[in-house]
Amino acid sequence: MLLCKIKGYTERQKLNQKLMRAAATGDIEAVQKLVLRGADIYCRDHQGDTALSLAAGSGYLDILDI
């Protein structure tokens, strides 16, 4: 569950969830595409992590340069 301040389950919320998964698994191409489509890199999950913190915590430091 994401904690972004978005009413309802919007397309942007779907993008944000995909971004979190892509960042956590090191899928840099997907991260780039999702950010270009409007995903919010500052959105936080239920544990307070952002996509960038998930990427860094998993060792995918190249994602931090996006």
UniProtKB/Swiss-Prot annotation:
Q: Where are the transmembrane segments?
A: none
User: Where are the annotated ANK repeats, by residue?
Assistant: 14-66
Pfam families in the cross-refs: Ank_4
Is the keyword Transmembrane assigned to this protein? Answer: no
Q: What is this protein called?
A: Putative ankyrin repeat protein RF_pd14
Record InterPro entries? Ankyrin_rpt, Ankyrin_rpt-contain_sf
Species name: Rickettsia felis (strain ATCC VR-1525 / URRWXCal2) (Rickettsia azadi)
Cite the entry's keywords alphabetically. ANK repeat, Plasmid
